[in-house]
C-alpha cells in the first residue's frame, strides 16, 4: 500500500533524533489508560530464578477459566514476550493485546515482565524469559505441545533466542513459536547485508539509527552483539528448532 504525501511528511518529521529511554517509556505508558482493563480476566504470578522473582501476568479467555482451581492443567497456553526495544514497554501496556489474544484463541496467555535495559543489560531479560519458559514447559500439569511461544519485535528476538538456548541446554524444547516482526539482526548500518535496512532505514519512524540505539542500550559490550542469543540471525545451526510462523 502506497503512503500518501502527507503521511510520509509526518513520518519523516517523527523520524528525527535518537532514543530517549525515559520519554519513550512515558509515551508507551499512555497505553495503560485503557477503560476496558477492569473487565480483563487476569492474575499475577512470579517465577523465582535464583536471585529474582520474575513477574508474570496471566490472562484467561473467560471468567470460568479464571476461577478454576487448576488454572493451567490441561490448558493450551501462549507464552508471550512483549516488544519495546528491550528497554521500553511493560506487560501492563500490552493488556488489551493479551486479553484479546486469550479471548480470540480460547487459550491462556502468560506474559513475562522481563527486566529492561539499560538498567539490566543482555542477557538479563533473556534469562528472565528463559526461567519462566523452563518452569512452564517442565511443569507436571503442562504439555510442551500445548504451549506456543510468541513475541513481537524485541519479544520476537527473545523468543527466537530462547528456543536456541533451550536446544543448546537440553532442559526443555518449545514445539512451536510465533515471531512477529522479530528484531533478530545486529547490524543496522549503511553497510548492512539487507537492502531493507539500506533502502528503507530512514524516514519511516522506526529508523535504522533508532534500532542501533536500542541495540546499544541492550548490549553490555561489543562482544555481546556477536552472540547468537543476542542476534539470533547469527546462529549457523538452526536444527532442532520449533515449528515457526
Write out the residue ranges for each language-model feature:
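An N-terminal hydrophobic leader/cap segment in hydrolases
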Residues: 2-47
Amino acid at each position: 500500500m502506497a503512503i500518501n504525501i502527507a503521511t510520509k511528511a509526518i513520518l519523516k518529521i517523527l523520524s528525527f533524533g535518537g532514543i530517549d529511554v525515559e520519554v519513550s517509556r512515558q509515551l508507551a505508558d499512555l497505553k495503560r489508560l485503557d477503560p476496558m482493563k477492569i473487565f480483563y480476566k487476569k492474575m499475577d504470578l512470579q517465577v523465582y530464578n535464583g536471585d529474582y522473582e520474575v513477574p508474570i501476568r496471566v490472562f484467561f479467555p473467560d471468567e470460568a477459566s479464571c476461577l478454576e482451581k487448576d488454572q493451567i492443567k490441561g490448558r493450551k497456553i501462549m507464552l508471550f514476550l512483549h516488544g519495546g526495544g528491550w528497554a521500553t514497554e511493560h506487560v501492563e501496556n500490552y493488556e488489551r493485546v493479551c486479553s484479546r489474544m486469550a479471548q480470540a484463541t480460547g487459550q491462556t496467555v502468560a506474559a513475562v515482565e522481563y527486566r529492561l535495559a539499560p538498567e539490566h543489560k543482555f542477557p538479563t531479560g533473556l534469562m528472565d524469559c528463559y526461567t519462566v519458559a523452563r518452569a512452564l514447559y517442565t511443569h507436571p500439569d503442562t504439555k510442551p505441545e500445548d504451549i506456543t511461544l510468541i513475541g513481537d519485535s524485541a519479544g520476537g528476538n527473545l523468543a527466537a533466542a530462547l528456543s536456541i538456548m533451550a536446544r543448546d541446554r537440553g532442559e526443555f524444547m518449545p514445539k512451536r513459536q510465533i515471531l512477529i516482526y522479530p528484531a533478530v539482526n545486529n547490524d543496522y548500518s549503511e553497510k548492512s547485508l539487507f537492502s531493507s535496512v539500506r533502502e528503507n532505514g530512514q524516514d519511516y519512524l522506526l529508523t535504522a539509527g533508532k534500532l542501533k540505539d536500542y541495540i546499544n542500550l541492550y548490549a553490555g559490550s561489543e562482544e555481546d552483539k556477536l552472540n547468537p542469543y543476542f542476534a539470533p540471525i547469527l546462529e549457523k545451526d538452526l536444527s532442532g528448532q520449533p515449528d515457526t510462523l
